Amino acid sequence: MASSGLAYPDRFYAAAAYAGFGAGGATSSSAISRFQNDVALLLYGLYQQATVGPCNVPKPRAWNPVEQSKWTSWHGLGSMPSAEAMRLFVKILEEEDPGWYSRVPEFNPEPVVDIEMHKPKEDPKVILASTNGTSVPEPKTISENGSSVETQDKVVILEGLSAVSVHEEWTPLSVNGQRPKPRYEHGATVVQDKMYIFGGNHNGRYLSDLQALDLKSLTWSKIDAKFQAGSTDSSKSAQVSSCAGHSLISWGNKFFSVAGHTKDPSENITVKEFDPHTCTWSIVKTYGKPPVSRGGQSVTLVGTTLVLFGGEDAKRCLLNDLHILDLETMTWDDVDAIGTPPPRSDHAAACHADRYLLIFGGGSHATCFNDLHVLDLQTMEWSRPKQQGLAPSPRAGHAGATVGENWYIVGGGNNKSGVSETLVLNMSTLTWSVVSSVEGRVPLASEGMTLVHSNYNGDDYLISFGGYNGRYSNEVFALKLTLKSDLQSKTKEHASDGTSSVLEPEVELSHDGKIREIAMDSADSDLKKDDANELLVALKAEKEELEAALNREQVQTIQLKEEIAEAEARNAELTKELQTVRGQLAAEQSRCFKLEVDVAELRQKLQSMDALEREVELLRRQKAASEQAALEAKQRQSSSGMWGWLVGTPPDKSES
């Protein structure tokens, strides 16, 4: 997805120069020697695709295998757009050498300076405890490198999240213990006042460690977890596989790790369960047809089910399929919903009123989205309802957390830089507003961070960890939320002052009615007002109309099904008749062929009969000629005997 820092195409050219391509670096041969062969060839092909375009040069001769391999890598990209080739080039370089951006100062003109966050309306009184127990002045600004802060002179020592007293402003937390390794694309969840961090990506390597932050003492600790692959005790010595882009979901006193990218991906999604009491990972046996392996998906807890949407599979193919895992039976269900959103990954999802699934943002390989999609889990129909307030900017890799009817969105990238605003969406009125904003390249404006919600001493807090914006982060920030009534009034004020962002529907639905349904289902809605009865009557009338229309559609569907069944029966009969006719035709064809063979044999016999007749005729003629000759000879003999008798010649004794 998009990364913060330099905007494209400058980020691409900086990456190309660092890798050894272009005028700012060495030749492509040096790049091939720097990386593994397959990576170097892929970088070469993407660089040529981004700077030259599709490969139109002839294939090199076979005696030059290096040039032939480079040509094959370039030619295999086909007609990939230049922008997509640039982003894939940077993404692959970051996976191979995540620290490249910090080592290219000539392409980073902005100096490292302290970045001042927006000041609150009241004077801050926050003082954080240092790692050694002594007090330190309150930080008023955040440095880009996370090490330089400006302070005030007043000193007050507070404990845990109570140290954060400023509302709606992000505050860096000073934590105890050894911090986890910086990372992004990890998973995070809260179980019993502890924030658990699992996996992630650091320097292009997937992680498998499990860390816990005690939200009471703000102390990090590494969990020495065991992995139980089966029922035998010997399997407990194994380790859980490293992963990134997965989802952590709390369930009771345990939590699940769902999906994620791994070094050796399996064919289907794996669900793992961690028990904090036994510090043991185990593989959950599921039933039904599991989704294909993926990462960057969203997994949302809805009642007693997990709803999974989208992501990117092991072949980097974007997905938009929908699957539901029943946590009581551990059975997967592949759902075919109506009006499915475009494929995406690194988006955020939330559940409202145990009925509606909301999807926001995310991106493809070259584009970031700012669209909001709502899935009615009862009718399984997607829609793009009207939104109010300030329209959010496109982003991917952001994090979200729900507090009541409010959905908070933090961070993400938009192909140019990190997104600095912290947004909140009132899911009852679908109204956007800005809660807080930071400036500069700070961890809060990065991708792959996590955001969790915790209630501590009666106050609601948002806690962020990690992220990547050219640098990997392991910083922890907290934002103390205002009272619910204040936040609702602020949301309504933003809704009245902001502009409406009207989006086209994906399916033929009444979106105003859907918004009213969401408001009706919300526990914190305003149906206790004077116009609640009128709204309820209108909703009932609309519901009756929809039910009547649904009944008509169902009747028509039944009729169509009956007609289809009749047509299929007729088709089956015609198919049988056709098969019978084909059998008869085959028999007739066989008989005709046999007759043709007999006729051919008879013709041959007739031809031989003609020859015999001619031979017989010849013999007859020869016989007639012989008989004629014999007759003539006999006549001559008889005449010669008479003359001989007259002259006294005795007859021939042999004739007698």
From Swiss-Prot:
GO terms for cellular component: cytosol; peroxisome. The keyword Membrane does not apply. It is found in: Peroxisome. SUPFAM superfamilies: Acyl-CoA binding protein, Kelch motif. Residues 527-636 form a coiled coil. Kelch repeats lie at residues 194-241, 254-304, 305-354, 356-405, 406-454, 461-507. Keywords: Coiled coil, Kelch repeat, Lipid-binding, Peroxisome, Repeat. Highly expressed in leaves. Expressed in roots and seeds. The keyword Repeat applies. Its main location: other. Residues 129-148, 627-656 are annotated as: Disordered. Belongs to the ACBP family. Binds medium- and long-chain acyl-CoA esters with high affinity. Can interact in vitro with linoleoyl-CoA and linolenoyl-CoA. Binds phosphatidic acid (PA) and phosphatidylcholine (PC) in vitro. May play a role in the biosynthesis of phospholipids. May be involved in lipid degradation via peroxisomal beta-oxydation. This is Acyl-CoA-binding domain-containing protein 6. It comes from Oryza sativa subsp. japonica (Rice). The lineage of its organism: Eukaryota, Viridiplantae, Streptophyta, Embryophyta, Tracheophyta.
